[in-house]
Amino acid sequence: MSKIKNPKLAPLARPNFYIGVKGFELTKRLKNLGGQGKLKIEWAESHMPVLMQIRARFFREKPFKNFTPHQSCLDGAGLKIGCCLHVTKETAVLAKTLKAGGARIALCGSNPLSTQDDVAAALVEEGIEVFAWRGLNSKDYYWCLNKVLDTKPNITMDDGGDLVSAIHLKRKELIKNIIGGTEETTTGVIRFRAMEKDGVLKYPVVAVNDARTKYLFDNRYGTGQSTIDGILRATSVLLAGKNFVVSGFGWCGRGIAM
């Protein structure tokens, strides 16, 4: 692997910039982060037994290895999945599971403030292409997003809808290679349903947010707990004796109230 040649796109002078795998290399500091990230991922794996069972089956069967849905997929890479998700230890477990099935994964961060640099470094060492670092600006965000699209994905995985929107607005030549996508958030689903209503959505997108396992568990318990955790981290207040007002009664609101 060699260093990036074009400093205007992604200068390695950025102390926490890294990217993988083809044509790039980790800086020494970020290589040191990889070990820490690996431990985080292993911790998450120990608490995600269902996904680990799926990974074991994927590892045996390799369902994506020789999957060529379009004649244009002739590079032997198998199914190519482009992801714009939160780059966290939990997402890392998903990415490694898809890779175990024979897919080529390219990942960028859906939120500059949620990216865990050590986890991203560990994924690069696992052979997954990562275009993300914590705190990137708007220009770099879209640079990273377009690097994922440059891999010509067959499936998109979105958290907020930016991949699908970019494809339909500026990268329409990629649509012929795509068989479908997924969207995790209510925000993204609303965007895509509006596109479908207007007749401009060019490939099917699965609304992950509508799955029972999403709203009954993740929205209710996950968002409920993480919201309280965020309040505590931001304010350091004692909850005892406080009055809470929850505006809204969807599954997230119910979880917070619980």
Where are these regions (language model features)?
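Glycine/serine-rich phosphate-binding loop and adjoining beta1-alpha1 elements at the start
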Residues: 2-66, 76, 107-242
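N-terminal cofactor/phosphate-binding cores enriched in small/glycine residues
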Residues: 33, 51-54, 82-86, 90-91, ...
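Extended, highly charged clamp/arch subdomains and adjacent linkers
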Residues: 67-70, 97, 101-104, 152
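Conserved beta-strand elements of the Class I
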Residues: 80-82, 245
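Active-site cofactor/substrate anionic-group-binding motifs, chiefly glycine-
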Residues: 82, 95-114
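Gly/Ser/Thr-rich loops at beta-strand to alpha-helix junctions
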Residues: 83-91, 111-115, 161-163, 250-252
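Glycine-rich phosphate/diphosphate-binding loop of Rossmann-like nucleotide-binding domains
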Residues: 88-103, 218-258
